[in-house]
């Protein structure tokens, strides 16, 4: 079973939400709302009627700056929007660090943690996965390509709904973890938003090609 292909779309002005229609061939489209200033983020409710048409395709992300976000949002605004999204049954990405501070619902949502400057221990990551994986849609773990990072990431693929992201310039590593069991593979819709991201259509093409090879080998 192939992973779900996510096309990450930076929303740099509120009107960029209209671009969603260009990427519906991806399994999921991540709307990176942290590219907006607070004033524009607060206008998101004006677009719910439009977004509702596509919500089964969407991941809404308000990434904290400390975890790779672009613009920091006030916690109060983020809480308000996340609660609205939950009520409207949208899939969103919420950081472990935010859940530790606030009582935000995360059932059937993406719970994430991003490490940039150091490599956590496997035991620490397993603790996070064990805590959130039963209720979450996926627990997403992103780590830098420091010495020993593969030994941290690969054992996590034994879990059913874990997404692992090697923050490496080697794009093939993202494909590899998808083949080995990562629930989601992140790619870009317009421009790379992180190290190693490939264009989403290319990622779809790669996995379709691998699927064709696997299927034909089973037939023969």
Curated annotation (Swiss-Prot):
Pfam families: DHquinase_I (PF01487)
Role this protein plays: Involved in the third step of the chorismate pathway, which leads to the biosynthesis of aromatic amino acids. Catalyzes the cis-dehydration of 3-dehydroquinate (DHQ) and introduces the first double bond of the aromatic ring to yield 3-dehydroshikimate.
Oligomeric and partner information: Homodimer.
Keyword rRNA-binding among record annotations: no
SUPFAM superfamilies: Aldolase (SSF51569)
Range of residues in the leader sequence: none
Entry similarity comment: Belongs to the type-I 3-dehydroquinase family.
Keyword vocabulary terms for this entry: Amino-acid biosynthesis, Aromatic amino acid biosynthesis, Lyase, Schiff base
Cystine pairs: none
Domain of life where this protein originates: Archaea
Entry's Gene Ontology BP terms: 3,4-dihydroxybenzoate biosynthetic process; amino acid biosynthetic process; aromatic amino acid family biosynthetic process; chorismate biosynthetic process
Active-site residues (renumbered): 114, 140
Protein name: 3-dehydroquinate dehydratase
Coiled coil: none
Amino-acid biosynthesis in keyword set: yes
């Amino acid at each position: 079973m192939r992973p779900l292909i996510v096309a990450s779309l930076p929303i740099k002005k509120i009107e960029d939400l209209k671009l969603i229609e260009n990427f519906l061939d991806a399994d999921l489209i991540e709307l990176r709302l942290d590219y907006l200033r607070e004033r524009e983020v607060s206008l998101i409710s004006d677009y719910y009627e439009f977004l509702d048409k596509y919500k089964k395709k969407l991941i809404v992300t308000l990434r904290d700056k400390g975890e790779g976000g672009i613009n920091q949002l006030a916690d109060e605004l983020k809480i308000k929007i996340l609660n609205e999204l939950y009520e409207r049954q949208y899939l969103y990405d919420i950081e472990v660090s935010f859940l530790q501070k606030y009582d935000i619902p995360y059932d059937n949502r993406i719970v994430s943690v991003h490490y940039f400057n150091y490599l956590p221990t496997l035991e620490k990551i397993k603790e996070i996965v064990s805590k959130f994986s039963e209720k979450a849609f996926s627990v997403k773990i992103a780590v830098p390509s420091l010495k020993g990072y593969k030994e941290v990431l690969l054992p996590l693929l034994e879990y059913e709904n874990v997404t692992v992201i090697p923050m490496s310039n080697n794009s093939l590593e993202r494909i590899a973890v998808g083949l080995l069991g990562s629930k989601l593979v992140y790619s870009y819709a317009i421009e790379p938003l992180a190290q190693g991201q490939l264009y989403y259509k290319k990622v779809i093409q790669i996995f379709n090609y691998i699927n064709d090879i696997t299927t034909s080998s089973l037939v023969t």
